[in-house]
């Protein structure tokens, strides 16, 4: 079994490799996801200007439990609704070095259902 500290270092290395290839632009900003044990965070970032355009998390919103798949679906819908309201329809999905499974996949599927294309 890999200790949690080493697992996080491995994830950060994978995320660095992903970020070398993925770049958010003004036309297609980057949908970044961060997952902790108790919460999930999503933000849409324009890397050319270095600005966060839209964000949503289980801390800022009134979702009682933040560390489960249902909360990830809610955050996916919420960030997609906020993005569509600002005129953003196409994004690049940045899974943040996490496996595309569980909460990360649920957030992506909910964002797609709510109108984002990636």
Swiss-Prot record:
Biological processes annotated in GO: translation
Gene Ontology cellular component list: cytosolic large ribosomal subunit
The entry's keywords: Ribonucleoprotein, Ribosomal protein, RNA-binding, rRNA-binding
MF (Gene Ontology): 5S rRNA binding; structural constituent of ribosome
InterPro entries for the chain: Ribosomal_uL18_bac-type, Ribosomal_uL18_bac/euk
SUPFAM superfamilies: Translational machinery components (SSF53137)
Family annotation (CDD domains): Ribosomal_L18_L5e (cd00432)
Pfam families on file: Ribosomal_L18p (PF00861)
Family to which this protein belongs: Belongs to the universal ribosomal protein uL18 family.
UniProt function note: This is one of the proteins that bind and probably mediate the attachment of the 5S RNA into the large ribosomal subunit, where it forms part of the central protuberance.
UniProt-listed HAMAP family: Ribosomal_uL18_B (MF_01337_B)
Binding partners and assembly: Part of the 50S ribosomal subunit; part of the 5S rRNA/L5/L18/L25 subcomplex. Contacts the 5S and 23S rRNAs.
Protein name: Large ribosomal subunit protein uL18
Taxonomic source organism: Acidobacterium capsulatum (strain ATCC 51196 / DSM 11244 / BCRC 80197 / JCM 7670 / NBRC 15755 / NCIMB 13165 / 161)
Gene name in the database record: rplR
């Amino acid at each position: 079994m890999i200790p949690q500290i080493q697992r996080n270092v491995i994830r950060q290395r994978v995320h660095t490799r992903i970020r070398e290839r993925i770049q958010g632009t003004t036309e297609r900003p980057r949908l970044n996801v961060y997952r902790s044990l108790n919460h999930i965070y999503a933000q849409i970032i324009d890397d050319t200007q270095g600005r966060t355009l839209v964000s949503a998390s289980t801390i800022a919103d009134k979702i009682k439990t933040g560390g489960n798949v249902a909360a990830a679906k809610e955050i996916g819908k919420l960030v997609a609704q906020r993005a569509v309201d600002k005129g953003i329809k196409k994004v690049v999905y940045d899974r943040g070095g996490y496996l595309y499974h569980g909460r990360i996949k649920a957030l992506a599927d909910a964002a797609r259902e709510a109108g984002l294309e990636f």
